[in-house]
C-alpha cells in the first residue's frame, strides 16, 4: 500500500483537484476528462511502473492538478449549488491542503475522505487499494454511470455522516475550525464539480482509463520487448566481434531467429554474417567449438535451409562480385591461416563441403557454402578486420574460418551441411593446431595469432636468437605467405582444396554448430582475421622491405650502419619503430652491442616472445637496446655507437625516419668532439663521431609523416648549427625556439634552433629526436649515437647537446645546445625542452658534457612513452619506457618517467640533462646543471623549494605561459627551450611547465656554463621548489615538480599532471603519468602517491632506475634504487632494488642511497624484479609493468598499463611501444613487441583498407 499511500497522497492533491476539474468537467468537460485520464494513468503506472516512475507520474499529475486548481476555482465558483456540498469537501480539501502541509497526520485519511467525497461509494468500495481505485475508478465510475449519480447522493449521505447535518453548515463550521473559508471555497468547487462530473465522466474515465492502461501495458511491454530485440541484434553485432553471439543467437532463438533476421537482413547481411563468424571463432576456441558442434548441429540443419537459399543466392551474387578481390586477400590469409589448420584437419573440414568444392573454384564454390562464405567474407571482411584488429581476442583460427563461415552459416552449412561435421572438423583443426591460440597458422592471422605468433616467434627467437628474429619471423611469414598464397589461390579458386576451403567450410559448419547456438562465434573474427592476418604479414613484409630498402639506400649513403638501421626500421611498428634495430647484424654501430641490441629489437618486434629471448627483450626495449648491449655507449641514447657513429647516426636518422611511421627525425647533431663530458663512452663516441654526426646530419633529414621535421644537419663543423634538426616539433606545437640559427629544419618545427646558441659546438649536438614511431619515439641519437633505441628515441647525445626527440612530436628539441629548444646556456644547452610531442623529451644537456644530457637527451621520446634518457654512461637508465611513454631515462641517474617523464640525469654533471619527455602526455626534460646547478633540476630532490608549482599550474616560474611558453615550444607543454641564453625558460607551461600535460623542464644548464640556462631552468622548474602537490617533495602534485612534468613533463619542469618529479599522482620525480623519476642523486623526491622519487604516476612510469611505479611510477634514483612507489596502475618494476608498488606508493623517497623501497600500492604491484606480468605480461608487473632490467637499467621501465615485459637486458627499459620490455598497450598485458607489432600492423592494415 505504500504506492497506495503515495497515491492517496497524490490523491489528496489530485482528487480534490480532480473534483475541481470535475466541476470544471461540466464547465469544461475536456479538462476534467484529461485530469481523470491522468489519474487513471497514474493508477496504472503505480501498478505497472516502479516506484520511481510512479513518483514521476505523480509529480506530473500533481503539477497538472495544481495548475487545474489555480484555474478551476474561478470556473468552480459559479457552481454555487454544489459548493455547499463541496463545503463538506472544502474542509476536507482544506484539510487536504493542510494535510499537504502536514500529510503525516491526515494525508491518507483525508485523501480517502476527499476521494470519497469525490467518488464517494466507489471509493469507499475501492478504498482498500488506492492505486486500484485510481485504475478502477475510471472503469467503475464510467461503468456505473447512473449509479455514480446515485452514489453522489450516497456520497452526500456519507458526507453528511461526517458533516451532512447541514451540508452547507458543516462546510462553514468545519471550514472555520479546519481551514479558513478562503481555502474551502476553492476546494468546494472541486468537490462539487466532482459530483457533477462523475455522471459525465464515467465514459471518459472508462475510455481513457481503459485505453491508457492498455497503452501503458502494451507500450511498456512493447518497448521492453523492442528493447531486447534491439539489444539482441546489437549484441549479435557485438558478438560477431566477440564471439558471444551464440548466446544471443539462443536468445534470438538460435539459428532460425538469428538466421531469419539475417535473411531479412540480407541488406545487413554482412552484419549478420559477422555475428556468426565470431561465434565460430569462439567455437574455434577448443571447447566451445566442440560443445557447440554437438549441441548446435541439429538446429543448424533446420535454420540453414531458408537462409541458405535466399541468403545464399544473394550472398553468392555479392560474393561473386567481390570474390576476385577477396579471394586474393583470402588466398594469402587462408593460405597462411588455413595452411596449418588445413594440414591439421584439412580432410575433415571439407568433408561436408568437398562435393561443393569439387564443383569448382570459388565460383563452383558457389554451392552455398563456398560462394556465400566468400561473399559474406567480402561483405563483412572489412568490418571483421576492423573488429578483429580491435578485438585481438578473436582466435586466429576463427580468422581463417570467419571468411568461410559467414556464408556457410547462412547457406551451405545451414542448408546442406550438418553442423556437426563443420564443428568437429573445425574442432579437429583447432585440436591439431592445439587451440586457436596455439595453432601456428592461425597465430599469424588471428588473435590467437598473438599467442601463436608468440609461439612461432619464440621458436624463431630460439632458432635465431642472435639473428634478427624479425627477419626470421618475416622470412617464415614470407615463406608461409608464398606457400599459403598459392594454396589460398587454389582454395579460393577451387575450394576443392580440402585445406583452405574445407576449413572455411568447416568454419561454415561451425555456423551449423552455431545453430547449436555458437554459430556466431567464428565468422567475423575469421573474416577480419583472414584479411588482417594477410595484411599483417604481407603489409609488414612489404612495409619492412620498403623501409629496409629506403633505409638501406639512405643508410648506404649515410654509412654502413644503415644496414642495421634498416632492420630497425623494419620493425616498423606502427607506432614505433625501433630505429635502432637494424636488420642486419652489421655492427656498423657498435657492432657487438648494437647487433645484439638490434637483433633483440627485431626479436622484440617480431617475436612477441621477448621473454624467451632475453636479447629480444633487451633489444626490444629500445633503451634496452643500447643500454644493454653497450652500456657504455649509452646506446640508449642513441645507441650511439662508436662506430662511425657519425655514419650511424645519419643512417640511423635516415633509417629511422623511414622507420618511424610518424617518422622521427633525427637531427643530426654535430657534436664536435667536445662533447667530452658526455659519458666517456659518449664522449669517445661523440668525439669520434662529431664528424660523423655532422655527416649524418644531412641524412636525417627526412621528415616524417607527421611532420617530423627533418633536420638538416648543419654543417658538421659548426656544432652549434648542427642542431638543426629540431625534431619533430610536437605536433601540437611547438615552436621550437629556434633560437639562433636553428636552421629550421624543414621539418615542422624547427626546433632546432640550432642550438646555435649553444656555445659549445659540442653541445650542438642536436639530436633530433626522432619522431620515431608514432607512439613511440625514438630519440634521435644525438649526434653520434645512432638512435638506437627501439622506441626510444634516443637521443643521442652526442654531446650533451643532444636533444632528444620527442616522441610525438617529437620534438625533441632539445638540442643539445640549447638548440632545440631551449638551449640553455650553450653548454648547458639544456636544450631540452622537450617538445610536446606527446612527449617529447628533451633533453638538455648541460654543459657538462656529460650531461648526461646526452644521455638523457637521449631520448625520451616516446610517444606515449618517453624514451629513455640516456645518461651518459649510464645508459641504463634508459630504460623504462612507458608505454605511454615514459622516457626512460637516463642513464644513470635518470630515470624516466613513465608517462613521460623525463628523467634527469643523474650524474651530477650529467645531471642536467635528463630530459625526460613526456612522451605520453608530456614531456619534460630536465636538465640539470651539471651537477648541481640543476638543481634541482631534477633532482628531485632538489628541493626544494619553494613552491611547488601548482599542479596544474605552471611550474616553474618561468613566466612563460605554458603554451606560449616562450620558448617552449612544446605544444602541450612548452618546452623550455630557451635560447641558451635565455634565462627564462618560459617554461611555464601551462601545466606547468612546459608540457602541457607535462612539461618539460627547462634544463638547467650546468650552472656555470649556463647560468642563464640554469636560471631558466630554474624558473622553470627549478625552482626547486618543486614540491609535488601530492606530495612529493620535490614536486608538485600535479606535478609540478619542476622537474617533473605533468603528464610527462620533464622533470625539470613540472609536469602538468605530474611533476616531474612528482608524479601526477605522485611520482616523485617522475612526472605525472609517467613519472620519471628522478634523478639520481638526490634522489628522493617524493612522489605523490609516493613513490619515491620517481615514481611516475600513472600510466606507467618507468622507473628510474630503481623503482618503478606502477602507474607510473618509477622511480628511480639511481643510486638508491629508490623505490618509488608506483602508483598507479601498473607498477613498473622497480629497479633493482627498489621495488615499487604499483599503486602504492611508497614511498618515497629515498635518498639516493636509500633504497627505500616503496611500498606497493595496490593496484598491482610488481615486484621489482619479478617480472610477473599482470596481465600476462612478461615480466611485466601487473599492469604491465615491466621490470626493469637489472642493472641499473633496472629502471627499466615499466609500463603501466601494459605489461611490459621485463626489460630485456639491463636496463633497457622498455621500449615504448615496441619496446621490448614493455609495451604499453593498454589492454595488453605485456605484449611482446612482436605481438604489439602485429596489432599495430593490423590497425594499420585496417586503416589502409
Curated annotation (Swiss-Prot):
Free-text note on domains in this protein's UniProt record: Contains F-X-F-G repeats.
Main location: nucleus
Matching Pfam families: POM121
Residue numbers carrying Phosphoserine: 94, 345, 351, 371, 393, 396
GO CC annotations on file: endoplasmic reticulum membrane; nuclear envelope; nuclear membrane; nuclear pore; nucleoplasm
Bilayer-spanning residue ranges: 35-55
Region described as Disordered: spans on this chain: 1-27, 136-220, 319-530, 602-776, 959-986, 1226-1249
Region named Pore side: 56-1249
Region (Cisternal side): 1-34
An MF annotation (GO) of this entry: nuclear localization sequence binding
Subcellular location as annotated: Nucleus, Nuclear pore complex; Nucleus membrane; Endoplasmic reticulum membrane
InterPro entries: Nucleoporin (IPR026054)
Basic and acidic residues composition bias: residue spans: 11-25, 450-462, 472-486
Name of the encoding gene: POM121
Name of the protein in its database record: Nuclear envelope pore membrane protein POM 121
Annotated segments matching region Required for targeting to the nucleus and nuclear pore complex: 1-285
Top-level lineage group: Eukaryota
Biased composition (Pro residues): 168-190
GO BP terms: mRNA transport; nucleocytoplasmic transport; protein import into nucleus; RNA export from nucleus
Biased composition (Polar residues): 405-423, 491-502, 683-696
Alphabetically ordered keywords of this record: Endoplasmic reticulum, Membrane, mRNA transport, Nuclear pore complex, Nucleus, Phosphoprotein, Protein transport, Repeat, Translocation, Transmembrane, Transmembrane helix, Transport
General function of this protein: Essential component of the nuclear pore complex (NPC). The repeat-containing domain may be involved in anchoring components of the pore complex to the pore membrane. When overexpressed in cells induces the formation of cytoplasmic annulate lamellae (AL).
Family: Belongs to the POM121 family.
Protein topology in the membrane: Single-pass membrane protein
UniProt biased composition (Basic residues): 1239-1249
Amino acid at each position: 500500500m505504500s504506492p497506495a499511500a503515495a497515491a492517496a497522497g497524490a490523491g489528496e492533491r489530485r482528487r480534490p483537484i480532480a473534483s475541481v476539474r470535475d466541476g470544471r468537467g461540466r464547465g469544461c468537460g475536456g479538462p476534467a476528462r484529461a485530469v481523470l485520464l491522468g489519474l487513471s494513468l497514474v493508477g496504472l503506472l503505480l501498478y505497472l511502473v516502479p516506484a520511481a516512475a510512479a513518483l514521476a507520474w505523480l509529480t506530473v499529475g500533481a503539477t497538472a492538478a495544481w495548475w487545474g486548481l489555480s484555474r478551476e476555482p474561478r470556473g468552480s465558483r459559479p457552481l454555487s449549488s454544489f459548493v455547499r456540498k463541496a463545503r463538506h469537501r472544502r474542509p476536507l480539501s482544506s484539510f487536504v491542503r493542510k494535510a499537504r502541509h502536514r500529510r503525516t497526520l491526515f494525508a491518507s485519511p483525508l485523501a480517502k475522505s476527499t476521494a470519497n467525497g469525490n467518488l464517494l461509494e466507489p471509493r469507499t468500495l475501492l478504498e482498500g487499494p488506492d492505486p486500484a481505485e485510481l485504475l478502477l475508478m475510471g472503469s467503475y465510475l464510467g461503468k456505473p454511470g447512473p449509479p455514480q449519480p446515485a452514489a453522489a447522493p450516497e456520497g452526500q449521505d456519507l458526507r453528511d455522516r461526517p458533516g451532512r447535518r447541514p451540508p452547507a453548515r458543516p462546510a462553514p463550521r468545519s471550514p472555520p475550525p479546519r481551514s479558513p473559508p478562503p481555502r474551502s471555497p476553492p476546494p468546494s468547487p472541486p468537490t462539487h464539480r466532482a459530483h457533477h462530473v462523475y455522471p459525465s465522466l464515467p465514459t471518459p474515465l472508462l475510455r481513457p482509463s481503459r485505453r491508457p492502461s492498455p497503452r501503458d501495458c502494451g507500450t511498456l511491454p512493447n518497448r521492453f520487448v523492442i528493447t531486447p530485440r534491439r539489444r539482441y541484434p546489437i549484441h549479435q553485432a557485438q558478438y560477431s566481434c566477440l564471439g558471444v553471439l551464440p548466446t544471443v543467437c539462443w536468445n534470438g532463438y538460435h539459428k532460425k531467429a538469428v538466421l531469419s533476421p539475417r535473411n531479412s537482413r540480407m541488406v545487413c547481411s554482412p552484419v549478420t554474417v559477422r555475428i556468426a563468424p565470431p561465434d565460430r571463432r569462439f567455437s574455434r576456441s577448443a571447447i566451445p567449438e566442440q560443445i557447440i558442434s554437438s549441441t548446435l548441429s541439429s538446429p543448424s540443419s533446420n535454420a540453414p535451409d531458408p537462409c541458405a537459399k535466399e541468403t545464399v543466392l544473394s550472398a553468392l551474387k555479392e560474393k561473386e562480385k567481390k570474390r576476385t578481390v577477396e579471394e586474393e586477400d583470402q588466398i594469402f590469409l587462408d593460405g597462411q591461416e588455413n595452411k596449418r589448420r588445413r594440414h591439421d584437419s584439412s580432410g575433415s573440414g571439407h568433408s561436408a563441403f568437398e562435393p561443393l568444392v569439387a564443383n569448382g573454384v570459388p565460383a563452383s564454390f558457389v554451392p552455398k557454402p563456398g560462394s556465400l562464405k566468400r561473399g559474406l567474407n567480402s561483405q563483412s571482411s572489412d568490418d571483421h578486420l576492423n573488429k578483429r584488429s580491435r578485438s585481438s581476442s578473436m582466435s586466429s583460427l576463427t580468422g581463417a574460418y570467419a571468411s568461410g563461415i559467414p556464408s556457410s552459416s547462412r547457406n551451405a552449412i545451414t542448408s546442406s551441411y550438418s553442423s556437426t561435421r563443420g564443428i568437429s572438423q573445425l574442432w579437429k583443426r583447432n585440436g591439431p593446431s592445439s587451440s586457436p591460440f596455439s595453432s601456428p597458422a592461425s597465430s599469424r592471422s588471428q588473435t590467437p595469432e598473438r599467442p601463436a605468433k608468440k609461439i612461432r616467434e619464440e621458436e624463431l627467437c630460439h632458432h635465431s636468437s642472435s639473428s634478427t628474429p624479425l627477419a626470421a619471423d618475416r622470412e617464415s611469414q614470407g615463406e608461409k605467405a608464398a606457400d599459403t598464397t598459392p594454396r589460398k589461390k587454389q582454395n579460393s579458386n577451387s575450394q576443392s582444396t580440402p585445406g583452405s576451403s574445407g576449413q572455411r567450410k568447416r568454419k561454415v559448419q561451425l555456423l551449423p554448430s552455431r545453430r547449436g547456438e555458437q554459430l556466431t562465434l567464428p565468422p567475423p573474427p575469421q573474416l577480419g582475421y583472414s584479411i588482417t592476418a594477410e595484411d599483417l604479414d604481407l603489409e609488414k613484409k612489404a612495409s619492412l622491405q620498403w623501409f629496409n630498402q629506403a633505409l638501406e639506400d639512405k643508410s648506404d649513403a649515410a654509412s654502413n650502419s644503415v644496414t642495421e638501421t634498416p632492420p630497425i626500421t623494419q620493425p616498423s611498428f606502427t607506432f614505433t619503430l625501433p630505429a635502432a634495430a637494424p636488420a642486419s647484424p652489421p655492427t656498423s654501430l657498435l657492432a657487438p652491442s648494437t647487433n645484439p641490441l638490434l637483433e633483440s629489437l627485431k626479436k622484440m618486434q617480431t617475436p612477441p616472445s621477448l621473454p624467451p629471448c632475453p636479447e629480444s627483450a633487451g633489444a626490444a626495449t629500445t633503451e634496452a637496446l643500447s643500454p644493454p648491449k653497450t652500456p657504455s655507449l649509452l646506446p640508449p641514447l642513441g645507441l650511439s655507437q662508436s662506430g662511425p657513429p657519425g655514419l650511424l647516426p645519419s643512417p640511423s636518422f635516415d633509417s629511422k625516419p623511414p622507420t618511424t611511421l610518424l617518422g622521427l627525425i633525427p637531427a643530426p647533431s654535430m657534436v664536435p668532439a667536445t662533447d667530452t663530458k658526455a659519458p666517456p663512452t659518449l664522449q669517445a663516441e661523440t668525439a669520434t663521431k662529431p664528424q660523423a654526426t655532422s655527416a649524418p646530419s644531412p641524412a636525417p633529414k627526412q621528415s616524417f609523416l607527421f611532420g617530423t621535421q627533418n633536420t638538416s644537419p648543419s654543417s658538421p663543423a659548426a656544432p652549434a648549427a648542427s642542431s638543426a634538426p629540431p625534431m619533430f616539433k610536437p605536433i601540437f606545437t611547438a615552436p621550437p625556439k629556434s633560437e639562433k640559427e636553428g636552421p629550421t629544419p624543414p621539418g615542422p618545427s624547427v626546433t632546432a634552433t640550432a642550438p646555435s646558441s649553444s656555445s659549445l659546438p659540442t653541445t650542438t649536438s642536436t639530436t633530433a629526436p626522432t619522431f620515431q614511431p608514432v607512439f613511440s619515439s625514438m630519440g634521435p641519437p644525438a649526434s653520434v649515437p645512432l638512435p638506437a633505441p627501439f622506441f626510444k628515441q634516443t637521443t643521442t647525445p652526442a654531446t650533451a647537446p643532444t636533444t632528444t626527440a620527442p616522441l610525438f612530436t617529437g620534438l625533441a628539441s632539445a638540442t643539445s645546445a640549447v638548440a632545440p629548444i631551449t638551449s640553455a646556456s650553450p653548454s648547458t644547452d639544456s636544450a631540452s625542452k622537450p617538445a610536446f610531442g606527446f612527449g617529447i623529451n628533451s633533453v638538455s644537456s648541460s654543459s657538462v658534457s656529460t650531461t648526461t644530457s646526452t644521455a638523457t637527451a637521449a631520448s625520451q621520446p616516446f610517444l606515449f612513452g618517453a624514451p629513455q634518457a640516456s645518461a651518459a654512461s649510464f645508459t641504463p637508465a634508459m630504460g623504462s619506457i612507458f608505454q605511454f611513454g615514459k622516457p626512460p631515462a637516463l642513464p644513470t641517474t635518470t630515470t624516466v618517467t613513465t608517462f613521460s617523464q623525463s628523467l634527469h640525469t643523474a650524474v651530477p654533471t650529467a645531471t642536467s640533462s635528463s630530459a625526460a619527455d613526456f612522451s605520453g602526455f608530456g614531456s619534460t626534460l630536465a636538465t640539470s646543471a651539471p651537477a648541481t646547478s640543476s638543481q634541482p633540476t631534477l633532482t628531485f630532490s632538489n628541493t626544494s623549494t619553494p613552491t611547488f608549482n601548482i599542479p596544474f599550474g605552471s611550474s616553474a616560474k618561468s613566466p612563460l605561459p605554458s603554451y606560449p611558453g616562450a620558448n617552449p615550444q612544446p605544444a602541450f607543454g612548452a618546452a623550455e627551450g630557451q635560447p641558451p641564453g635565455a634565462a627564462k625558460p618560459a617554461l611555464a607551461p601551462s601545466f606547468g611547465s612546459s608540457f602541457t600535460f607535462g612539461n618539460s623542464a627547462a634544463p638547467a644548464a650546468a650552472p656555470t656554463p649556463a647560468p642563464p640556462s640554469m636560471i631558466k631552468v630554474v624558473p622553470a622548474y627549478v625552482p626547486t621548489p618543486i614540491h609535488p602537490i601530492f606530495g612529493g617533495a620535490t614536486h608538485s602534485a600535479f606535478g609540478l615538480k619542476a622537474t617533473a612534468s605533468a603528464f610527462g613533463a620533464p622533470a625539470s619542469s613540472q609536469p602538468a599532471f605530474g611533476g616531474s618529479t612528482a608524479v601526477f599522482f605522485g611520482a616523485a620525480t617522475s612526472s605525472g603519468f609517467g613519472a620519471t623519476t628522478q634523478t639520481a642523486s638526490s634522489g628522493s623526491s617524493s612522489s605523490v602517491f609516493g613513490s619515491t622519487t620517481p615514481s611516475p604516476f600513472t600510466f606507467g612510469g618507468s622507473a628510474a632506475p630503481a623503482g618503478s611505479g606502477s602507474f607510473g611510477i618509477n622511480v628511480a634514483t639511481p643510486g638508491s634504487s629508490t623505490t618509488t612507489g608506483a602508483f598507479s596502475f601498473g607498477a613498473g618494476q622497480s629497479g633493482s632494488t627498489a621495488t615499487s608498488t604499483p599503486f602504492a606508493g611508497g614511498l618515497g623517497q629515498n635518498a639516493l642511497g636509500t633504497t627505500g623501497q616503496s611500498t606497493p600500492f595496490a593496484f598491482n604491484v610488481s615486484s621489482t624484479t619479478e617480472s610477473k606480468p599482470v596481465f600476462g605480461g612478461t615480466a611485466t608487473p601487473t599492469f604491465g609493468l615491466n621490470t626493469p632490467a637489472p642493472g641499473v637499467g633496472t629502471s627499466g621501465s615499466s609500463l603501466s598499463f601494459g605489461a611490459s615485459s621485463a626489460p630485456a637486458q639491463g636496463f633497457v627499459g622498455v621500449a615504448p611501444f615496441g619496446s621490448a620490455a614493455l609495451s604499453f598497450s593498454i589492454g595488453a598485458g605485456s605484449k611482446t613487441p612482436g605481438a604489439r607489432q602485429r596489432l599495430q600492423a593490423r590497425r594499420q592494415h585496417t586503416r589502409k583498407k
